[in-house]
Amino acid sequence: MAKPAKPNGGAVGRNPERTRGRILSAALREFAANGFAGARVDAIARRAVINKRMLYHYFGNKEHLFREVLRRKITERQSSAEGLSGDPAESLPFWFKLSCRDTDWVRLLEWEALQGGGKKVIDEKSRRALATRALGRIRKQQALGYLSGEFEPGHLLLAMRSLTTFPMAFPQLTRLFTNRSVSDPHFQRKYAEFLKKFAAAFRPAVGRRNKTNYEN
């Protein structure tokens, strides 16, 4: 029987970008499983098959590593939305389907809420800037007639985030309310259809299509 690979900082370190990617992927799994407070650097190093010294060489400390994990995930999600129209009837099903595939992102946010409450979050300045841009897109959607102008943009954004992530964040309630597992393809298909109809039903006026990315 082959022996499991041992952490090897030297061999892996010959390709810095590859090593960095392995660390970030391992850290994502560890943070998603245990949250920031519960994640252990030695566990991340084992997942990445490197030694702790090399991990600290690349990222300094656990907080810096968590910040990079968040930035990487946000960049990935933004890239996946390129070309997405500003119509919520299209964007809501898209973000729901993405959340079904990207449950690690949902878990990261859940752990952050459980462990941090309403306190400042890691990398708050950059994330607040992203939120400000998202609110700007909500206002544009209101101006184009996709969303009612009578609601505050922040409330609309919060509701839209909830609609697209709640089933994955609370799978037990999804099962109790629908008699379906969130991983059930039938549920995913029907809920995506619901989101499309829901967004269309609450449209105050016929808005013209606007090919502006809507990042989640």
Positions of predicted regions on the chain:
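Hydrophobic alpha-helical connector segments
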Residues: 79-107, 127, 153-157
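Amphipathic alpha-helical segments used for helix-helix packing
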Residues: 100-121, 170-178
